[in-house]
Amino acid sequence: MSVLQVLHIPDERLRKVAKPVEEVNAEIQRIVDDMFETMYAEEGIGLAATQVDIHQRIIVIDVSENRNERLVLINPELLEKSGETGIEEGCLSIPEQRALVPRAEKVKIRALDRDGNPFELEADGLLAICIQHEMDHLVGKLFIDYLSPLKQQRIRQKVEKLDRLNARA
């Protein structure tokens, strides 16, 4: 397994729409494993393949405190959503920035697991929010897209400054 490079805004590759996975095979499973390793190394709770410049409909999530409840969503589809909630969200592609984002309180999805088996899942709370956040990535949408243009600009400037500082280190 390897840790992959996470793209940061304003990288336009984050805006690409991911293509469906045609077959879950050893290559897809390797991508899933690398994505988990990357997500854990970056101390995230979710990662979409788009964020590591792989433009396929793959998401990995682990919102557990012990980091031992892996969830793989291949070709996820949103079936239902209900209620309204919102928390301050962060994103590995928008480091050290957070903002309040409106989300559905509950979701029901259909996806394939790491072995290609179909399943449905009903989620609420942090898991529901994380699923929605990561599914947005698959269509080229970022949490900052929910914010005012001024807030978007401020966040972009902060991330660009942070990336410049990290490049010098």
Curated annotation (Swiss-Prot):
InterPro entries reported for this sequence: Peptide_deformylase, Peptide_deformylase_sf
Cleavable signal peptide: none
Chain sites annotated for binding Fe cation: C91, H133, H137
UniProt record, GO biological process: co-translational protein modification; translation
Annotated catalysed reactions: N-terminal N-formyl-L-methionyl-[peptide] + H2O = N-terminal L-methionyl-[peptide] + formate
EC numbers: 3.5.1.88
Pfam families assigned to the protein according to its UniProt record, in alphabetical order: Pep_deformylase
Active site: E134
Keywords: Hydrolase, Iron, Metal-binding, Protein biosynthesis
Cofactor: Fe(2+)
Comment on bound cofactor: Binds 1 Fe(2+) ion.
Single annotated GO MF: metal ion binding
Alphabetical list of HAMAP family matching this protein: Pep_deformylase (MF_00163)
Similarity comment: family membership: Belongs to the polypeptide deformylase family.
Biological role stated in the UniProt entry: Removes the formyl group from the N-terminal Met of newly synthesized proteins. Requires at least a dipeptide for an efficient rate of reaction. N-terminal L-methionine is a prerequisite for activity but the enzyme has broad specificity at other positions.
Protein name: Peptide deformylase
Organism: Salmonella arizonae (strain ATCC BAA-731 / CDC346-86 / RSK2980)
Organism phylogeny: Bacteria, Pseudomonadati, Pseudomonadota, Gammaproteobacteria, Enterobacterales
Gene: def
